[in-house]
């Protein structure tokens, strides 16, 4: 018999009476009146092993094993005694009567119990190897594998070719910071780790590969949040000779396929489509969570002449906005709840949170409860009631500031209330999956500090055909052929139709204040390639980490990555990053300069 004949978690009634050889780790050892029970674990699950004292040598070994010992068990599969079955285990109706027990490798005492659900993330990441033995982590990483496998199967069936692109490439600092790699051979010069394979996949379209994909690592040296990592995995795709609509249809179908085949979820037969401007107007976000039923109401125009300066000042400011958020049945919220929400929106730059409780609509002003009502004239109050559709028992929250602050703060409040216990109890949030496409993004954003336009997506995104004329006259009016796929408030993918004509690409560079010499230095290889009959092309990139996080119901993308970094971009397991030897620095012609001490 080989070292292992079956996986522990796959031993069931079909093997009754058969001798099996199992290998795994001791999850738990119990001594019950002279009989020792071992829960043996491998990647497929648990099986109960019974060690009877009749076999003295084997029993003596069993007495010495402890949690996380790596062992081999040989024994016979039998039914568990009546009343001792475990419906929670696939192997719960059987047990293995041990004939032979071999300790393949002992274990020191683990720093924690693997079934402890209250471990700090620091402990888990420091002892990641043990953490990965936990069933939930095993499940998450196998789910990740299945998602990648289904993506490959789907794209292969549609004629896509998996092509690797370079990991050592040229630094083009437009956007997030690059991770730089010094060149020993070319002193004083640096490679950059790719933020995405963007330019290479466009070059592959020019090179007539027609349909490309790869599941690849990307790197961005940016401040980290719960859903960000310095290195992350992208499902990167590009295709030639398809329109924007055809590209969206193709990858919408792929998304449906992957969700159905991996977790059995049937996404909408047709995803909703929403322009960027509508998403910002209704939800204050370009990745709205459509499960939450609350929406903004625009009030800027109605608040221009009120005596309440908190409203009238932003209403009369170029970039100002006044918006309301009606919460059905919110009148039952306590003053403590309101104060808590007020402090919450301050996180997003809001100076405060105005509110009105609707006690009785029919009474007009007299039916409202709020410290701000006295500062609003009748026309403003009528506009609030009519536009929000307020009913008795509701509360209306208001945000008034620069549009970005209003969108960020009221958008965050919308999600907080919707997903709260109050929101769930009052039907303000739906269960399930709500996918949509957000389209018609601005081509450019204006950077006040740099006094120039910057690319809202990236500088290789094509403007809409009817907006080409604005590139040189009014770039702020340009909309892009860009699209994001959003699911339950998470952007899981984004892409665009690309610029495929050299003259248009040069115009975009000029709009970004990238001069001809700088453009040639940074992107000359792309501009040259576009002159050789480049085809119309476009694509998309999905965030594999985010998709698996959502499918697994995990708290963080760190729970679906085998060896992740912390929010300080550190690997607690290997202690990276670390100092390097002075000799290595000399070989790279690098001298370290100590950071200046802050006063």
Curated annotation (Swiss-Prot):
GO terms for cellular component: cytoplasm. It is found in: Cytoplasm. It holds the Pfam family tRNA_anti-codon. The keyword Kinase does not apply. ATP binds at residues 220-222, 229, 491, 543-546. SUPFAM superfamilies: Class II aaRS and biotin synthetases, GAD domain-like, Nucleic acid-binding proteins. The record marks 32, 83 as: Important for tRNA non-discrimination. One of its GO terms (biological process) is aspartyl-tRNA aminoacylation. GO terms for molecular function: aspartate-tRNA ligase activity; aspartate-tRNA(Asn) ligase activity; ATP binding; nucleic acid binding. Keywords: Aminoacyl-tRNA synthetase, ATP-binding, Cytoplasm, Ligase, Nucleotide-binding, Protein biosynthesis. It catalyses: tRNA(Asx) + L-aspartate + ATP = L-aspartyl-tRNA(Asx) + AMP + diphosphate. InterPro entries: Aa-tRNA-synt_II (IPR004364), aa-tRNA-synth_II (IPR006195), aa-tRNA-synth_II/BPL/LPL (IPR045864), Asp-tRNA-ligase_1 (IPR004524), Asp-tRNA-ligase_1_N (IPR047089), Asp/Asn-tRNA-synth_IIb (IPR002312), AspRS_core (IPR047090), GAD-like_sf (IPR004115). Its main location: cytoplasm. Residues 198-201 are annotated as: Aspartate. Belongs to the class-II aminoacyl-tRNA synthetase family. Type 1 subfamily. Homodimer. Aspartyl-tRNA synthetase with relaxed tRNA specificity since it is able to aspartylate not only its cognate tRNA(Asp) but also tRNA(Asn). Reaction proceeds in two steps: L-aspartate is first activated by ATP to form Asp-AMP and then transferred to the acceptor end of tRNA(Asp/Asn). This is Aspartate--tRNA(Asp/Asn) ligase. It comes from Paraburkholderia phymatum (strain DSM 17167 / CIP 108236 / LMG 21445 / STM815). The lineage of its organism: Bacteria, Pseudomonadati, Pseudomonadota, Betaproteobacteria, Burkholderiales. The gene is aspS.
């Amino acid at each position: 018999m080989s070292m292992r004949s079956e996986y522990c978690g796959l031993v069931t009634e079909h093997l009754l009476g058969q001798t099996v050889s199992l290998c795994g780790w001791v999850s738990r050892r119990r001594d019950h009146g002279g009989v020792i029970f071992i829960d043996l674990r491998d990647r497929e699950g648990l099986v109960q092993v019974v060690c009877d004292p009749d076999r003295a040598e084997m029993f003596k070994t069993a007495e010495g094993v402890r949690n996380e010992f790596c062992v081999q068990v040989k024994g016979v599969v039998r039914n568990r005694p009546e009343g001792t079955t475990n419906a929670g285990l696939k192997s719960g109706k059987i047990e293995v009567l041990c004939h032979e027990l071999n300790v393949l490798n002992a274990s020191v005492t683990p720093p924690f119990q693997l079934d402890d659900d209250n471990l700090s993330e620091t402990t888990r990441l420091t002892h990641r190897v043990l953490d990965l033995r936990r069933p939930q982590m095993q499940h998450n990483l196998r789910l990740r594998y299945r998602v990648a496998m289904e993506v490959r199967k789907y794209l292969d069936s549609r004629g896509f070719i998996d092509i690797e692109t370079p990991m050592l490439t040229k630094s083009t600092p437009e956007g997030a910071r690059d991770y730089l790699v010094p060149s020993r051979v070319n002193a004083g010069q640096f490679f950059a780790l790719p933020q995405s394979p963007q330019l290479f996949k466009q070059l592959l379209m020019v090179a007539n590969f027609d349909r490309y994909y790869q599941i690849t690592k990307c790197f961005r040296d940016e401040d980290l949040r719960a859903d960000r990592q310095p290195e992350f995995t992208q499902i990167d795709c590009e295709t030639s000779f398809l329109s924007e609509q055809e590209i969206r249809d193709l990858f919408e179908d792929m998304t449906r396929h992957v969700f159905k085949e991996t977790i059995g979820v049937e996404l909408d037969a047709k995803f909703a489509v929403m322009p960027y401007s509508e998403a910002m107007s209704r939800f204050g976000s370009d990745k709205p969570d459509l499960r939450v039923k609350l929406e903004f109401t625009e009030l800027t125009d109605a608040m221009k002449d009120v005596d309440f300066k908190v409203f009238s000042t932003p209403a009369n400011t170029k970039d100002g906005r006044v918006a309301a958020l009606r919460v059905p049945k919110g009148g039952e919220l306590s003053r403590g709840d309101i104060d808590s929400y007020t402090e919450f929106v301050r996180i997003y730059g809001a100076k405060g949170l105005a509110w009105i409780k609707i006690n009785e609509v029919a009474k007009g002003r007299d039916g409202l409860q709020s410290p701000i009502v006295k500062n609003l004239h009748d026309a403003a109050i009528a506009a609030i009631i009519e536009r929000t559709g307020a009913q008795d028992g509701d509360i209306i929250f208001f945000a008034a500031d620069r549009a970005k602050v209003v969108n960020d703060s009221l958008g965050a409040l919308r999600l907080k209330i919707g997903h709260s216990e109050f929101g769930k109890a009052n039907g303000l949030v739906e269960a399930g999956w709500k996918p949509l496409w957000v389209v018609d993004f601005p081509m450019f954003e204006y950077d006040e500090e740099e006094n120039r336009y910057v690319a809202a997506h990236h500088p290789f995104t094509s403007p809409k055909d009817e907006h080409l004329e604005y590139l040189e006259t009014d770039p702020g009016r340009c909309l892009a052929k860009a699209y994001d796929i959003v699911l339950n408030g998470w952007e899981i993918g984004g892409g665009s139709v690309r610029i495929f004509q050299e003259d248009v690409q040069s115009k975009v560079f000029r709009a970004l204040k990238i001069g001809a010499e700088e453009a040639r230095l940074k992107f000359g290889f792309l501009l040259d390639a576009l002159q050789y009959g480049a085809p119309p092309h476009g694509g998309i990139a999905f965030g594999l980490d985010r998709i698996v996080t959502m499918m697994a119901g995990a708290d963080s993308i760190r729970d679906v990555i085998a060896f992740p970094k912390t929010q300080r971009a550190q690997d607690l397991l290997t202690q990276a990053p670390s100092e390097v030897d002075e000799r290595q620095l000399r070989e790279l012609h690098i001298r370290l300069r100590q950071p200046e001490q802050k006063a």
